[in-house]
Amino acid sequence: MNPSLDQSGVELVAVINSFNRRSLLERAITTLTSALQSAQFGSAIVVFDAGSEDGSLEFLKAWRENNPAHNLAIIEATSDRRSFSDGVNIACADAIARFPKTRWLFLYETDNCLLNIEPLEKAIRLLNLEPQLAAAGFTVKKHDGTFFGYGMRFPSMLSFALGQNLAALCNLHSPNNSAWRNSDGIRWRTCDAVFTSPLLIRRQAWEQTTGFDAENFPFSDTDLDWAWRCARLGWGMAIIASEDVIHDNLEQLSAWSANRVVDFHRNRFRLLKRHRGKQIALLKPVLFLRHGLETLILKRRSRVDPAAKEKLAKRKQMLRTVWSNYS
């Protein structure tokens, strides 16, 4: 991040959603700012805090005061707009308004680490070389070096009917990767949807799609819906081969994850209805049967496994709500 550049010289803004994961946030901010300090382009950071109560907001304010050259802006959520999608949309709108010459929006989460500036430089070069690409993500790994998923193919009704575990066993979620290509020393390929951890987005594509659909996809599947809408407009998604990008929550689940299984089913149903058609309603009897089988299995398991009791309650909830689109 070049401190000599004023706001008019900022070309890239990193957007971070923060909610009650201070230890991860500290690591994410530290590695990001360290990488950006060596960048040849002007940059800034906008953090949306969704109501953290673990000291995250206080850490951010102290960091901003102690590091003014890092161009760190903080947005505190209002009570009625605290979802993940709201946070990204609000922060991106603020970034564009605050830095009018911004060309790139870098969606970066608290469980990300950027080890150096090279991945970002490659992503910018690739998007400049390939004008049909809306965004570029990276092959990512955990802190221990193990591979972590970076994207997936657009989901089918079959994969939804089978459930996440069985669909994964059948390889129905694997990215539909193209062959690897090389452009200006950058090894990359495409797939349907690239996750937002992290993701460099072309401003033009973001504005054309009007960002995330926060009303229908406040949390899960918002990135899939956005990628699908991009594809319908002719945009593509790229993955860049990299060894320098981390995606690892270190087993610290966000408070946003508390109702994940129900949210997943509700949003996946909406996603498939929007992009695959109204025939998704024909799956309801199949989904009801699946939830019934899951309920029976969890009921037996809950006798010896206390953790299964909460899962059982969620399955019972889905049994009741599947007929009303999980609402």
Task: Set out the residue ranges of the language-model regions.
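A conserved acidic beta->alpha catalytic loop
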Residues: 31, 48-58
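Glycine-rich, basic loop-to-helix element that forms the pyrophosphate-binding segment
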Residues: 78-97
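Short beta-strand-to-loop acidic/aromatic patch adjacent to the donor-nucleotide binding site
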Residues: 101-113
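Conserved donor NDP-sugar-binding/catalytic core segment of glycosyltransferases
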Residues: 113-151
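A recurrent flexible, glycine/aromatic-enriched loop bordering the glycosyltransferase active site
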Residues: 167-201
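A short, conserved alpha-helix in the catalytic core of glycosyltransferases
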Residues: 187, 192-210, 215-243
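Active-site-adjacent helix/loop segment of glycosyltransferases
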Residues: 225-228, 232-306
